[in-house]
Amino acid sequence: MIYEESKMNLEQERPFVCSAPGCSQRFPTEDHLMIHRHKHEMTLKFPSIKTDNMLSDQTPTPTRFLKNCEEVGLFSELDCSLEHEFRKAQEEESSKRNISMHNAVGGAMTGPGTHQLSSARLPNHDTNVVIQQAMPSPQSSSVITQAPSTNRQIGPVPGSLSSLLHLHNRQRQPMPASMPGTLPNPTMPGSSAVLMPMERQMSVNSSIMGMQGPNLSNPCASPQVQPMHSEAKMRLKAALTHHPAAMSNGNMNTMGHMMEMMGSRQDQTPHHHMHSHPHQHQTLPPHHPYPHQHQHPAHHPHPQPHHQQNHPHHHSHSHLHAHPAHHQTSPHPPLHTGNQAQVSPATQQMQPTQTIQPPQPTGGRRRRVVDEDPDERRRKFLERNRAAATRCRQKRKVWVMSLEKKAEELTQTNMQLQNEVSMLKNEVAQLKQLLLTHKDCPITAMQKESQGYLSPESSPPASPVPACSQQQVIQHNTITTSSSVSEVVGSSTLSQLTTHRTDLNPIL
């Protein structure tokens, strides 16, 4: 009973219980509980030792870091744009014949059916340009409707669209912030002159809107949007990450609808990203300020062969990067009827869309060059290292050879000096021996005495015989003394030579 009462009191005092597994602590306030949960989140969760005796090694090595990056998709996001563009360029080269066949089939169709040959694949930056053009327009959601077969005028252009276009193309002429409210009659021949500094954005947007045409005009095509909903979301997310400034004015629904239409059309026409159909300008949005972006009547199929003939001509001009204003300032002459004069500016607008495509294989080549650059740099670096090592070895070899030659010369001079020293030692020993033999010699003293005795002044009167005997004794004594002196001198010279040798040894 006491235990139950204490438990109830504890529950009343601390009503907040930790929900972590294996933890049943209680806390009086929610703040304490949040701090406790944060501690749980910060602790490492190792597996139980009973089930797994070996703890998993979670050391952050470079290999695991690269593996995690591959799992997340970091490297694929960096390289997907170049690979995708290069793949599209290859598909373009392999599907030229299919495009001509689809164009022939599209010539027999009228109305919304002609939009099925519109461009479906564009580079990532062009798609983002279209999103930037369409989003700031508050009327864009009301414009994407079924295209009627009559001509109509286009409304005023918002200032945010022109500012976005001006920011996107700074290298061209500046675009004013306000556009004319109404447009002239599209049936006039003078309206074929195209003066568009932002022709690339307009053409890309026209191709995208033409791509949306059949889905919007045909109610039966709307279920095709649902299977591509996830892909459209992915494309929308990628576009938002590249251009976060485009999220303005609350047009997320319009942009999502456009991306869904793009995703549905990409599966239907995957190989038509180079030859946009000339009739794609039927469903242009109202914020295009140029006179030829009107709706073309759907009951004129006779200009179709002419446009099919003009396709190779514009394809031949697709690589003219140095002349972007080839069809911008010069008016296109009227060909057969007023309708053909109205369609020809659309073909002129198609050319910048085509000029966007050729840099795709160059991007692939640039990537291959980037891939080859590290190997080339490493090869040159190794060559420089080898050359430097060779030069260093050569210098060291010359230095060692010079040292060896110098050592040989020094050894020869040392041997010569040693020979001279030994000769000088012998001479010194001989001279010392002579000095010792002749220093205080008794012979000289006896000779002096004998000479003194033999002289007539000092010699006695009668002593010849003892003198002779005395001379013999002196000679015998000198012989014995000389032998003894020579022995003494020899011993002394040997001792001196040994001492002198020890003195000369440090020099050697």
From Swiss-Prot:
Domain of life according to the entry: Eukaryota
Annotated zinc fingers (C2H2-type), start-end: 16-40
Organism: Homo sapiens
Membrane-crossing segments per the record: none
Start-end of Basic and acidic residues biased regions: 369-386
Keywords assigned: Activator, DNA-binding, Isopeptide bond, Metal-binding, Nucleus, Phosphoprotein, Transcription, Transcription regulation, Ubl conjugation, Zinc, Zinc-finger
Protein name: Cyclic AMP-responsive element-binding protein 5
Span of domain bZIP: 375-438
Ranges of Low complexity composition bias in the record: 347-357
One Gene Ontology CC term in the entry: nucleus
Gene transcribed to yield this protein: CREB5
